[in-house]
Amino acid sequence: MANNISNTTLSLTKISCLLEAQEVVSDTLATFYLAGWKTCPSFIKAREIVAAMQMLYPDRLAFKILLFEDREKFRVWLKASQGDFAVSFGAKSKAMKHVTSPFVWSSNPTTFVGGCDDLLLFFRSGIAVGRPQGMHTSDEVAEISSTAVQEKPIFDYDLVVIGGGLGGLACSKEAASFGQKVCVLDYVKPSPQGTAWGLGGTCVNVGCIPKKLIHQSSLIGEIIRHDSARFGWKFDNEGKTVPVFDWKQLVANVDGYIKTINFKYKVKLRSKNVKYENFLGSFVDPHTVKLSHPRKGTKQITTRNVVIAVGSRPRELTCPGGEYAVSSDDIFWMKEKEPGKTLVIGASYVALECAGFLKGMGYEVKVMVRSILLRSFDQEMADKIGEYMEVQSGIKFIRKTVPQSISRLENRQLLVKWVDEKGKTCEEAFNTVLNATGRDPEVAHLGLDKAGVKLNEKTGRIMVKNEQTSTSNIYAIGDVVDAPELTPVAIQSGRLLSQRLYNNSSVQMDYDKVCTTVFTPIEYGCCGLSEETSKGRYGEDNIEIYHTNFVPLEWSLSSETRTASNSCYIKVVCDKSRDKFVLGFHYLGPNAGEVMQAMGLAMRLRFTYDQMVNTVGIHPMTAESLTILEVTKSSGGATTGGGC
């Protein structure tokens, strides 16, 4: 791999496999050695300082650079060199306790210098150059070496983040908090239906936030229709009149709230001294980014590091007339008309969530699915969700088919044609067709080839290791990489990345045991492995499943929600070979997200079944059911829970 430095005072032969070395100058009065990992900001600054000094004193100073690929390899070198340090600098030298990049020492005589700030002080003292006649004073050295770096910076920015979603914003603000000069680029290309939005990415504008608010509206509608009378509420003396749902009012209110969030994000960036540019970013080379805007034109900026956080967009429907379909980019922003009778195409969580809240608001809804529901989730839980949506919510599923064509009728409705699983040609008219067949990473416009960034050919997403791409100064986070497509994951990985780049942290993102919730009419929360994955990974004989059905107390007065077909369900997947260590947790019922957050912490702490059931529950809450799980699947025992 890398070459070793043959004439260094320290013996480096035993770790040469970890080292990349670049010889700068030789045979001069004093030679300085700089060891560090190549994207470390302090190491880069130290190299800029010595470059300036070399220009001042080309005949008196020499520099050798020991360049490591990453922080871990640098630390391995430090540890392996402790014996050499003790011999060269003394067992009580500060070198023995120095653990950060850069590590600087000099020869003639052998002297440990320290880090970046120590190096600058060393030059200011004049020791390094000896100050012979005609040489600059220490103050002049300090002034020249500092201005040589500051007046002509190598890059416009320390970090450019391409993408203004929550992951990109978290990364940029964290980097700025460590004194880095940061720029965020964010421009939303309108959807095929013309929908665009402000700062904050998918989650804030067309994802988590509007979805959760509209889901809540749907739940309120269900309570009004099915539960309110049972709980003593009447809307007139005869109990017949119910409120009328107003889609346009709901969308306007949600829109107003989202715009306040967009504005707050801009204010927050400004307060953190992060430059915000409403431009589309693409690569010219690994350190140069082109900014484009259809009205503002183009320009270029340079940067030391880049984080790609552009997220993903809905996949387009490819059948004839697919352009008539709206996507999740559009459904929350339909201000001019309500959805009406809707066909949802897809079996993803987006498809089922949208179908659920539209039905809850009183619209007729059908869902067309090609294969199984919620492919990446536990399939028993997915089937239970499908059963609930069909039996309890009244949503019809058109299974094992895809649309053959969509055409617009004279009355503005959309005529959808398909072939059912029996081979019969079918057609039906809808007011809205919602395409939710998946999402693709938004990478086509980035010019990744110009920066040497490689994609996973199977998924189309950027290949990374610890968020670092195939180009060392370019990183990627969020939906654009092969990781859980969840906003908190993007936020956490972005924040931790900045801490590693600019605050000497070594904490990596842990993508295991990440909680998530699907906001279908009956909510589903999960963390860890599915039953299928657990059996495949550890063997069916080593897996024990504890499970139960239950009816939440708040559902007990309503005959509609008390029926057995919609009873809630909990499943805990355990490894019998490891003290019933919990591998996966699955919850189907109200407030699933609130229940799952605590379980996520428990799973990160590697809790066991015994610890769970020995915890005192809160009565009478649905989460209390976790503490009284007794029935195993292998026993075949009944799982119907009793009431309070």
Language-model-detected regions and their locations in the chain:
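Short hydrophobic core segments
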Residues: 159-162, 281, 289, 300-311, ...
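Flexible, glycine-rich terminal cap/loop adjacent to redox cofactors
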Residues: 162-167, 171-197, 209, 213-219, ...
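FAD-site-proximal beta/loop scaffold in flavoenzymes
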Residues: 323-339, 428-503, 594, 598
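Non-catalytic, surface beta->alpha helical segment in thiol-disulfide oxidoreductase systems
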Residues: 106-136
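Glycine-rich flavin
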Residues: 149-157, 174-339, 369-375, 380-381, ...
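Glycine-rich dinucleotide-binding loop and its adjacent helix/turn
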Residues: 140-148, 208, 308-364, 368, ...
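Local sequence-structure signature of Cys/Sec-based thiol-disulfide redox active-site neighborhoods
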Residues: 8-73
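Extreme N-terminal leader/targeting segments of oxidoreductases
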Residues: 128-159, 177-178
